[in-house]
Each structure stands twice: as C-alpha cells, then as structure tokens.
Amino acid sequence: MTVTKMSWRPQYRSSKFRNVYGKVANREHCFDGIPITKNVHDNHFCAVNTRFLAIVTESAGGGSFLVIPLEQTGRIEPNYPKVCGHQGNVLDIKWNPFIDNIIASCSEDTSVRIWEIPEGGLKRNMTEALLELHGHSRRVGLVEWHPTTNNILFSAGYDYKVLIWNLDVGEPVKMIDCHTDVILCMSFNTDGSLLTTTCKDKKLRVIEPRSGRVLQEANCKNHRVNRVVFLGNMKRLLTTGVSRWNTRQIALWDQEDLSMPLIEEEIDGLSGLLFPFYDADTHMLYLAGKGDGNIRYYEISTEKPYLSYLMEFRSPAPQKGLGVMPKHGLDVSACEVFRFYKLVTLKGLIEPISMIVPRRSDSYQEDIYPMTPGTEPALTPDEWLGGINRDPVLMSLKEGYKKSSKMVFKAPIKEKKSVVVNGIDLLENVPPRTENELLRMFFRQQDEIRRLKEELAQKDIRIRQLQLELKNLRNSPKNC
C-alpha cells in the first residue's frame, strides 16, 4: 500500500460546512477565577455535559476538581466547594453519558472514584465518593465510559493495564494486559465492540475489549502516535503524533489493516500535543493544539483524498485542554454543530467556543442535525459482557433536548478483599519495570527491614523483661 503525502495547501471542495466559524462566548458567559491545574499530564482536565462543567484544579495535599452548574457563569469564588476525596493529583474526569450527575475520576493515588453530584450542585466540599475502585498498582491516567452500555467503565494505569469495571458490582471483570508501556489514549468505535489505544511503545492497537485480543497492531516508526480516535462507522482511525522530523502530524488508517497509513499530513512545527475531536454527524474533524490557541477543522470522506481542509479558528490565548458538550446540549436554533470549553490557564478562564454553520433561515436544519446518539443505554452490563453488541439509541434534536426518565446509579455494597482478575491479584506488588522503580523499591524494602528489626529488638527486650519478672516471682518466698 502506498502512503499519500498530502500537500500543506488546503484543498477546497464543495461542502455545506466550508463556512463554519468559531464564536467565542461573551465574558459574562465564561467561567472566571478558576485555579486550573498546572499538572503536565496530557489530558483535558475538563468534562462537560448538559448540566455541569467539571474542571481539575490546582490544590495542595491531594487532588480536587470543581463541579459548576452551567448557568452559573461569571467569576467563581475562591472558596467555591470542591470534590476533594483523592489523596493524589486528579489526572482525568469523565461524566457518565447516561446519568448526568455521575462523574468518574482517576488519580495518582492509584484509585478510580465515582461521585454523585447533588441536583443543584455542590454546597460544601465533597470528600466521600459513592464508589471507590481499587485495582491498579500504579497511578491511573485515563478513564472512559462505554458508549452504549450503562455502568461499564474502562481505566488505564501506569501499570500498563486496562481494567474493565462493572459498576453494578463495583469490581473489575476483565483486564487487558497487552501493552508494554504507558497507555496514552483510548477510543471506542460507535457500538463499543472495539477499543483502540496508543502507547508509549509507539504502537497503535485495535483490541476486542471483552477478550483482550489484539486484532490489529501497527508499529509506527515514521509517525510517533499520541492520540487516536475512531471515525464513526467509516472503519477508519485517525491518529495525531510527531513525524521523524519532529513536526506535528496526523495519519488516517484502515482499522482492518494497520500495516500502513492511508494518508499522512504534516500540520506544523509546534511542539504541543494535537487533540483530535470527531463529529460523526457532520463527519467533521477538529484538531486543537495544546499550548496554542488554534483549532483546525476538516471534513472526512470515504473516498480520496479522504481529508479536506475547511478552516481554522485562531485565538491568541493558549489552551491547556478542551471539554466538549454532548450533541444533545447544543443550540440548534443557532445552527451550532460543536461546542468546546477551552481551558486558559494563564487567565484562570474557561471559555465556551461554538462552531456555527451560517444559515439565513431560523427553521430547524435537518441536513446538519441527523439522528444522534442519545442518553438511553442500549445494553446492560450483563448483556455486553455476554457478547452482545448494539448500536447507540438515537434521538432527534428537532424538538430540542428533553430530559428522559431519570436513571439512578445504585452503588453496590462492597467488602474489602483482594482483587483478582484473570488469575492475578492486582493489589499485589508487581515487579519493577525500570531502574528507577527498582531503586525506589529497594530503598522501601530496606526501610521496611530496618523497621522490622527494630520491632524485633523491642520484642526481645520485652520478652527478657517478662522472663526476669517470672523468675523473680518463682524465687520470691510464698506469702503465708
């Protein structure tokens, strides 16, 4: 297969999205005064749904994040209540796609936690999670909810494992153990039957998640992959990464044949990570650079040249990460097709950016709003774990988003025990993988040995004292 090297010059074609533009919200509709985390982990640190905006914050003595009702814009008070139950920095947060007041978080403290946000938002600091999930032996960098199944959560840790949690029972039910280094990104196809990952070992993988079997694997020598996203039902993957000349690059792949990318395109010479976002309804791809203020957007097609450049949104304020509003939360009366929530660390600002298709008519535009995945799960955990796949339950945006009958998350009652998956106790110490880890483990063991020796010495002294007391009692004259 030959690789098509695309020109840097934009290719114009007839498209109803060629005039899409980005509109920044007015300052009074932004969220100001937020101490956004300074953590250098390559995540968005932001999650949004139709009710709440969650942002990971800078804090001392453990990790925390804010949860703000969307209507509460403007300046946020410094003492605003936080979710602060983690003992380490929070690295990722994701809202449950089917229950809009349930959020998952993961942290450097090796745990994943599930939180239930009160109806009107937080009134005081929240320290007790609805559910604590312990199964990783090192910090947890990623969490992802299954796209069609309720209460199935995926987590990826620095122990190179992906755990699949059934939250109905509060335990890991599967473990994917095919990676040889830190997992950088996870993405599902439309029905959640396939999982694709990128890894620090420079490999791109397509995995059957229930069995953990690797279906396709690419060793990316000329394109060091960082992020990956499934392109809806096109059977295509798009990755962002770095070329051999250290320029930012994207590549398009056939998910059934990862031997060679279909196309590669160099973007620019900046060093920040490229975050890809794909809208399956409009077939539009958005590329946002970490550390710059630009968002490029393209249209994806199944025929060559596959990728057509549309336009670029430019902003002088650099972005640390971006949250994305679900489709049913968009303003269809304004022909809004995508909405970002941009984290501007230097200003402590969260800035909504609406991507709008200019139309003269105020009527509902059916051509840009097809049926879209809604808020009802298609499967139960037992059905999905039993091997059933089902497409998302679709909804129309014509009448606007109407909240369906409320689903309630019921936390299982858990007993403390060892966590065994695939015959392996996940809470046991795992062997060190690097020299630094080996040294740290060695020094910890030395400290433990020293402490145990001191305890033994104290117990020996106590034993001798008791022996002397017993001897004295035996030798003392009996009381008459």
Curated annotation (Swiss-Prot):
User: Per the database entry, which stretches of residues form a coiled coil?
Assistant: 436-479
Q: Which Pfam families match?
A: DUF1899, WD40, WD40_4
Where are the annotated WD repeats, by residue? 29-77, 78-127, 128-170, 171-212, 213-259, 260-305, 306-345
Tissue pattern of expression reads: Expressed predominantly in brain.
Annotated GO CC locations:
actin cytoskeleton; cytoplasm; focal adhesion; membrane
Subcellular compartments:
Cytoplasm, Cytoskeleton
> Can you state the subunit structure given in the record?
Binds to F-actin and to vinculin.
**Which family does the similarity line name?**
Belongs to the WD repeat coronin family.
- What is the name attached to this protein's record? Coronin-2B
**Organism, as annotated:** Homo sapiens (Human)
